Amino acid sequence: MTGMVGTILRRKAEQNMTDVTIRNVTKRYGALTVIPQLSFRIEDGEFVVLVGPSGCGKSTLLRMLAGLEEISGGDLLMGADVINDRPAKERDMAIVFQNYALYPHMTVAENMGFALKLRKRPRAEIDERVDKAAAILGLGKLLDRYPRALSGGQRQRVAMGRAIVRDPQVFLFDEPLSNLDAKLRVQMRAEIKALHQRLKITTVYVTHDQIEAMTMADKIVVMNEGRVEQMGTPLELYDRPANIFVAGFIGSPSMNFLPATVAATNGPLLKTPEGVALPIDGGPTLTGRSEVTYGIRPEHLQLGETGIPAEVVVVEPTGSETQLYVTVGGREVVAVLRDRVDVRPGEKIWLTPRKGCAHLFDPNTGARIAG
């Protein structure tokens, strides 16, 4: 193994494990508490994505990790070391921002090597590390250009190259793809994931885009109002969301939710308030419950001859699939069908949930019951 990738991996092998622990971390602005006692751990080499709606505290947490925001309580640890009071420049972390944060009067090479220049590293070392990072990111022919002559994707690669050149223990990404168009976002998220697979550096990535989270992460932390709703692998969150918030946030289009009453017959029977029967299977334990929230993902609904009666409102064909917006008992439901279908607004259809794919939640707490 040669080049900068080999150098970074050898350095990691010589160091202690770079896990990151957030332990009872609190953030207050005056009397306002925006993060109340947050705790979780990021293992060495993991790619962890913090995801959630605007204002949930994910960027604030990232800035506290970077040393750009003070914490109000609790501890931040790298390995066994508490870094609460360690200045940002001494935390051995490199951050990539949404707006690239490139110096317009510096060339690509000068931008990438600037942190090493501030550390008064030898010119030969700076040039070598810049050249190796440029080779990893395909920037070799752009080193003499200025940021104004670069595309958005090229600028983001330069920002990533600047982080790589620093050879940090932890990478931090703060919504780095938000300014890019849809096609370039897809390309860049694949490049960032491939980069992590090569360098194996502990990475914390912030986004509001759950598609980015699902496609890039080893683990996802879903945040809401400064709290962790659930942490797990992408498929764990998709298959077994801990509550209605996670179920509705992970997946696109969002999971459908219908209120239901429980009637005990030979087995549990669910009906909407309008009397529409909702199929369930697997015999979930609903003893003592009179009401639940029924959840089913759009991609787990199929056209059938029986099932849930619905009326078509809007048909959206995309070529590879068809999205149907329908009403069930007066409530909007979305179905994503892989097959091309000939249905029209106003038409009555039946939707059949795929077996084993229904989710049940407590309507009062939002917590998962079964399914």
From Swiss-Prot:
Topology relative to the membrane: Peripheral membrane protein
MF-aspect GO terms: ABC-type transporter activity; ATP binding; ATP hydrolysis activity
ABC transporter domain span: 20-250
GO biological process, one term: carbohydrate transport
Keyword Cell membrane: yes
Location of the protein in the cell: Cell inner membrane
Keywords for this protein: ATP-binding, Cell inner membrane, Cell membrane, Membrane, Nucleotide-binding, Plasmid, Transport
Similarity comment: Belongs to the ABC transporter superfamily.
InterPro entries xrefs: AAA+_ATPase, ABC_transporter-like_ATP-bd, ABC_transporter-like_CS, ABC_transpr_MalK-like, ABC_transpr_MalK/UgpC-like, Mo/tungstate-bd_C_term_dom, NA-bd_OB-fold, OB_MalK-like
Record carries keyword Thylakoid: no
GO CC entries: ATP-binding cassette (ABC) transporter complex, substrate-binding subunit-containing
UniProt function note: Probably part of a binding-protein-dependent transport system y4oPQRS. This system probably transports a sugar-like molecule. Probably responsible for energy coupling to the transport system.
Binding residues for ATP: 52-59
NCBIfam families named among the record's database cross-references: PRK11650.1
Name of protein: Uncharacterized ABC transporter ATP-binding protein y4oS
Natural source organism: Sinorhizobium fredii (strain NBRC 101917 / NGR234)
